[in-house]
Amino acid sequence: MSGFIEIQHDEWVAATPDIVRAYYNDLSHREVARVHPRERLRQLAPGPTGPRFERLARAGWRTTRDVVERHERADGSVLDQFVVGAHWGRSIVARFYRSSDGARTGTLVELTLTQPLRPFVGRLLGRWQRRRLEAELREFAVDIKVDVERGYRTARRLRAA
């Protein structure tokens, strides 16, 4: 097994697509509200294609550091590409679709994670890595859903005293 792992996860959120997209793009809120408890974000100088940020993630006893470039596409989707660090080559695409769940309207968030496999490691640990990535993506989507439905407002900004 070598090549790529591609995982897709859909999550329904009880908010409009504009609010969910604004939430996903608001890195300062993700850092201040500690949406993902094992994650720290720090914005860097913009790269050649758009905003860049550093992501420190704690996994067990070790911390990984990644530099991520964000691309906002014309169709409204957002592409995060990991350009430096332990997860180099990984990309996450977030798409936001208007959806209705019975009597309620909301947003269907479609997350697609693509991870390259190293040739030797892919054969040995490919299935284990796929299960781990699926669990991480599900946890990430649920954290987004809970925080948005808790009452995210796009006007909130961090202010220095």
Feature map (PLM): residue ranges:
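Hydrophobic ligand-binding cavity/cleft-lining segments
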Residues: M1-T49
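Solvent-exposed residues in well-ordered beta-strands and their adjoining turns
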Residues: W12-T16, Y97-S99, T112-R118, D147
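Short acidic, gly/pro-rich beta-turn/loop elements at beta-sheet edges
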Residues: I19-R21, V32, T63-R65, S91-I92, ...
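Hydrophobic pocket/interface hotspot
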Residues: V20-Y24, R30, F53-R55, R70, ...
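Short, surface-exposed, polar/charged, turn-prone segments marking secondary-structure boundaries
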Residues: V35-L41, P48-P51, R70, Q81-V83, ...
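Hydrophobic-ligand binding "helix-grip"
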Residues: P37, R58-L108, T114-P116
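Short, well-structured hydrophobic secondary-structure segments
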Residues: G50-G60
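A conserved amphipathic terminal alpha-helix motif
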Residues: P116-A161
